Amino acid sequence: MANICVVGGGPAGAMAAYAAASCGNKVTLIERNEEPFKKLLLTGSGKCNYSNSDLKSDSYNFGQNHPFWKVLEELNSDWLEEFFKEKGMLTYKKDSLKYPRSERSDTVKKLLSSMLLEKKVDIVTRKKAVSIKKKSEGETNGEYNKEAGCFAVAFEDGEELNFDKIIIATGGKAYPSLGSDGAGYRLARELGHKVSFTYPVLTRLLTDDKDLNAVTGVRFKAKVTGEVDGKITESEEGELQFNDNALSGICIFNLSRFLSKPIEENAKCIIIVDFLPEMSEEELEEYLKKIPDGEIGRFFEITFGEKTAALLLKKIKDENRKNVKDISYIIKNFRIKITGHDSFNQAQVTKGGVDIDEVDENFESKICKGLFFAGEVLDVDGKCGGYNLHFAFASGYKAGMSAGKEI
């Protein structure tokens, strides 16, 4: 039986602790807050969109050739659904999004808490790990003592405890008010790991385009495309939301994964909005040709609504666009300069983190044997729609099982 410490009481940490304890180990879960799962309660607007039936390798930043994808092929959406059902939580699917049947995040919190209680996991709250050191022979009071454990964990209150294995599942930097301050990155660096620069993603994109003030509060189905220094990055379709000096909506959140870093590097970033993605430019041109003279304004208002119509017509006038080809181009290629993104205070996820090339398919460090990682502390980010939470659950389970069995 090994003595295993899991640092971080979120979904990844809970699954890691449960899995490791299921293998017959003594497991201690360390959580800096007064209780675990604070951030979990916010997911899916409080409904906990825990997974997505449309899991694909391109939904994440690592792609299909990375060993992590093989893990997700095994521990897929169906696996997680069955896992929860076996533990007593029914689920349901809306489109491809998966939720607990109760549509309440606290249902998942209660389930995870009961799972940890069942496996007698020792949950220690209000405890922050500030240092982890791998002990080698001669470093334990002058003599190596296997019974003392291979890792020394120092805490903010001055206490130091020894463990055989460590699983770091501290999350990233998103929602720092809930304890996500990047502490896990410091611990990883201390143990020899590279940590890439971090950026807030799945967040709003900011703009200083004053013309957009007229459409604040408007929502419109559209296709949005990111452009960085003249090169197209990615496209998404969905509901585009115009906020005060910002663009929002799931389609924008997904694009922020590709734009946050270039924004920080002062690249020229543009969002190109296609207000009629269901029609090609040629089809739209032909349609516009059939509209009688003097009726174009009516077409815009009926099709796009009063505020959006006014925005488009102003753009057409400002750029002196008069023929149907030019008008069609504006509708299909409305360009918005992006000047920034929201901070980690508003972002859902962190881009960047512990270098995943230094972690194997069992989520064990290639640098420090006995050290494992799970969840958002790793340089893994996925799309909106349950992808990131699924990775937290799956990576936590895999890390816990790997740590628990390798004794």
Feature names for model-found ranges:
Residues M1-A12:
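Beta1/beta-strand and adjacent pyrophosphate-binding region of the FAD-binding site
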Residues C5, A21-S45:
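Glycine-rich FAD pyrophosphate-binding loop
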Residues C5-V7, I30, A129, E160-P176, ...:
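Short hydrophobic core segments
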Residues L41-K109:
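A conserved beta-strand/loop capping segment in the N-terminal third of enzymes
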Residues T125-A148:
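A conserved short coil-to-beta-strand element within the FAD-binding core of flavoproteins
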Residues A174-L187, L191, D379-I407:
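A conserved FAD-binding loop/helix module that cradles the flavin
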